[in-house]
Design a protein with these regions (language model features):
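Basic, Lys/Arg-enriched alpha-helical interface segments
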Residues: 2-3, 7-57
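Enriched for short, Lys/Arg-rich terminal
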Residues: 61, 68-72, 76-87
């Protein structure tokens, strides 16, 4: 399965990364990037590892939530692709 980031999700990731570079330094920004990308890349192999709450509006539309430390990756599986909507 492949993982594709929607434009908004990629922009959110870049904003977080820039914030960490500016506010806490490059080493923490690299750790943040490794953690986020490592977790999201696992979705290619384990696409159903995120939680679905079918009693919510997002769950009714098959959106999943992958919790990564203090962040939530919102994604949806469509045929052979995982689409990352928000971070």
């Amino acid at each position: 399965m492949k993982v594709e980031w929607l434009t908004e999700a990629r922009a959110e990731y870049r904003q977080f990364l820039q914030y960490y570079k500016t506010e806490v330094g490059l080493p923490y920004a690299k750790k943040f990037a490794d953690t986020i990308l490592g977790s999201i890349n696992q979705l290619a192999e384990f696409p159903e590892m995120g939680a679905v709450k079918y009693d919510t509006l997002m769950g009714k539309h098959d959106f999943r939530a992958l919790f990564i430390e203090n962040y939530v990756c919102v994604y949806r599986i469509e045929s052979d692709t995982v689409y990352v909507y928000h971070l």
